[in-house]
């Protein structure tokens, strides 16, 4: 009789272990396979709710005021090459309105690779690769297609550093 009690106890223990393994694996599965987002901060959820009720015009005003308050510069979308043609037509009306501030000192510059010494070509390619974050092949094509705009909206201090570094390597870069 004690054998049957022991056997029953062992069976019960096995079933208990199996059921706890199954339930714990279900909890782990639910946690890792869940697509439900974690609970958001109530303050942020309220802001998101308010923003979602804004119209398109109100949203653009919100974005522009946030950019001005947080000092975020207007960067061209799609990189410097894609933004150059789109920026030219939009700049014409802005130039007429801002004729007086044009006399003030410029703070943002466009850097243009004009030419380079043939002997310094590998060094120039390497520097362009580092500055623009291009691959080696893209950098080589970029340098060989000079004159070409390197960067736009560069602060004066950074622009002067880049021009000096490129001049040391044997390249001519202009600041416009």
Swiss-Prot record:
A molecular-function term among this protein's GO annotations: mRNA binding
Family annotation (CDD domains): Ribosomal_L7_L12
Pfam families, alphabetized: Ribosomal_L12, Ribosomal_L12_N
Gene Ontology terms describing biological process: translation
Keywords, ordered alphabetically: Mitochondrion, Ribonucleoprotein, Ribosomal protein
Main location class: mitochondrion
GO CC annotation terms, alphabetical: mitochondrial large ribosomal subunit; mitochondrial nucleoid
Keyword Ribonucleoprotein: yes
Keyword DNA repair assigned: no
Subcellular location per the Swiss-Prot or TrEMBL entry: Mitochondrion
Classification via InterPro entries: Ribosomal_bL12, Ribosomal_bL12_C, Ribosomal_bL12_C/ClpS-like, Ribosomal_bL12_oligo, Ribosomal_bL12_oligo_N_sf
The protein's role, per its UniProt record: Component of the mitochondrial ribosome (mitoribosome), a dedicated translation machinery responsible for the synthesis of mitochondrial genome-encoded proteins, including at least some of the essential transmembrane subunits of the mitochondrial respiratory chain. The mitoribosomes are attached to the mitochondrial inner membrane and translation products are cotranslationally integrated into the membrane.
Subunit comment: Component of the mitochondrial large ribosomal subunit (mt-LSU). Mature N.crassa 74S mitochondrial ribosomes consist of a small (37S) and a large (54S) subunit. The 37S small subunit contains a 16S ribosomal RNA (16S mt-rRNA) and 32 different proteins. The 54S large subunit contains a 23S rRNA (23S mt-rRNA) and 42 different proteins.
PANTHER family per record: 39S RIBOSOMAL PROTEIN L12 (PTHR45987), LARGE RIBOSOMAL SUBUNIT PROTEIN BL12M (PTHR45987:SF4)
Family: Belongs to the bacterial ribosomal protein bL12 family.
Record's protein name: Large ribosomal subunit protein bL12m
Source organism per UniProt: Neurospora crassa (strain ATCC 24698 / 74-OR23-1A / CBS 708.71 / DSM 1257 / FGSC 987)
């Amino acid at each position: 009789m004690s054998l049957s009690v022991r056997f029953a106890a062992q069976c019960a223990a096995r079933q208990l272990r199996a059921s706890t393994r199954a339930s714990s694996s279900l909890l782990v599965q639910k946690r890792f396979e869940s697509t439900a987002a974690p609970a958001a901060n109530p303050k942020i959820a309220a802001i998101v709710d308010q923003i979602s009720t804004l119209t398109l015009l109100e949203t653009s005003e919100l974005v522009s005021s946030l950019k001005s308050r947080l000092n975020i510069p207007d960067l061209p979308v799609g990189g410097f090459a894609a933004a150059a043609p789109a920026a030219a037509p939009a700049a014409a009306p802005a130039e007429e309105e801002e004729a007086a501030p044009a006399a003030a000192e410029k703070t943002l510059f466009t850097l243009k690779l004009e030419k380079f010494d043939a002997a310094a070509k590998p060094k120039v390619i390497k520097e362009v690769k580092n500055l623009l974050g291009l691959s080696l092949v893209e950098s080589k094509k970029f340098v060989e297609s000079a004159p070409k705009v390197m960067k736009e909206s560069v602060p004066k201090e950074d622009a002067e550093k880049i021009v000096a570094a490129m001049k040391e390597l044997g390249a001519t870069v202009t600041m416009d």
